[in-house]
Amino acid sequence: MPKKDFYEVLGVEKGANDAEIKKAFRKLALKYHPDKNAGNKEAEERFKEINEAYQVLSDPQKRAQYDQFGTADFNGGGAGFSGFEDFDLGDIFESFFGGGFGGFGGSSRRRNGPQKGPDVQYSINLTFNEAVFGVEKEVSITKSETCETCTGTGAKPGTNSKTCPKCNGSGQIKVQRNTALGSFVSVNTCDMCGGKGTIISDPCSDCKGKGTVRKQKKIKVNIPAGVDTGNVIPIRGQGEAGVNGGPPGDLYISVRVMPDPFFKRRGDDIYIDQHISFAKASLGTELKVKTIDGEVKYDIPSGTQPGTVFRLKGKGVPHVNGRGRGDQYVNIIVDIPKSLNQKQKEALFAYMEASGEIQSSEKEGFFDKIKKNFK
C-alpha cells in the first residue's frame, strides 16, 4: 500500500510555513475529531492520518528527514498524541464549542498572568442642542476597582500569598489519558487556586481576598459637538479593574439623542418646514429663517412653488471631530387661507379678471357665486 503524502493529507503546499501547517491542522482536526464524529470509523482513521502528518511536518527535524527520504519512520511513532503538549488543543475546541471548553485548557493557561479588566457599557440621553453643540456630562457608574488596602493582591497587608501546592504555581493541572487513538494529554484549570497559581491564606478584610472592591464613581465625559444616536464614545481605562495586575478595561458611552420639535436631523444636515402665504410665494419675499444658530434672513424669488427646497450652506450640524458643518434645507409650504374678508375676495377676483381666468361679461354672476361660497 503506497504511503500517503503528508502535505496532501493536510492540504498544504510543500513549501508551506509553520503557521500554514498549524492552521490547516486546526481546521481538519476540528472537522474530524472523534468527539464530533462519534462512531464514525472513517473520520477516526482520517483523524489519525491528520495527526500523524502534523506530528511530522510540525517538527523541523522530522520534516527535513521526510522531505529528503520520503519517510517518517521515527520508532514507529504512529498516531499518538504525545507530541501535543506544545499545541494548544483548547484553541480548536474553543472555536467549535465556544470560549473556555472544559478539559482542554485553552485560555486557562493564561489565567494566572495579568489580564485587562472587562469593559463597561453606559447609555446617556442628550437633548438635541447638547448633541449639536457638545456638552460636558457627569456620569455615575458602579464598577470594580483595585483594592487600596491590599493594592490588588487580595492578601492582608503584611502577608503574602503562597504558591499553590497542587499546581506548583502554574494554575493548571495536566491529565494524561490513554485512548484507542493513543496517549492524550489534556490541561485543566487547577481547582484549588482557580487558575491563579497562588493561594491566599490570610485574605484582605476589605476585599475578602478578591483584590478588587465595588465602588460608585463619578466620571466627567466630554461629548463632542455633532454626535448622534448610536455613536459610542470610548473612555480609556475607566472600565472594570484588571486581573492579576492587568490594566483596567474601558468605558463605552452609547449616545441617544432626543428629538427636537422643530428641527429634523439627517446625518449632519438639518431640515425644516417654512410656511409662507400664497401672496408672498407669488411676489417673492424676505424670510426670517430659524437655524440652530438663530434667525437668518433669506430672500426667496417670486413664483416660488409649494415644495420648493432652499439650501442654507454650512448651517447644519458640525462634523464630529472634524472641520466644517452640514447644511440646512428649508422646505416651502404655501398656506392657502380657509376664509377671506371682502377686500381679499375682491383682490383675488381682480387678479382672476386680470389674468384672463374670467371674462368681463361673467363678472357679476361669478362674483355673486364667490360671495355665496365665502359666506
Swiss-Prot record:
GO CC terms in record: cytoplasm
Cofactor note (record): Binds 2 Zn(2+) ions per monomer.
Any one Pfam family match given in the protein's UniProt record, by short name: DnaJ_C
Chain intervals annotated as zinc finger (CR-type): 134-216
Chain residues that bind Zn(2+) 1: C147, C150, C204, C207
SMART domains with a match to the protein in the record: DnaJ
NCBIfam families named in the record: DnaJ_bact, PRK10767.1, PRK14297.1
Family under the similarity heading: Belongs to the DnaJ family.
Name under which the protein is recorded: Chaperone protein DnaJ
The species this protein was found in: Clostridium tetani (strain Massachusetts / E88)
Gene designation: dnaJ
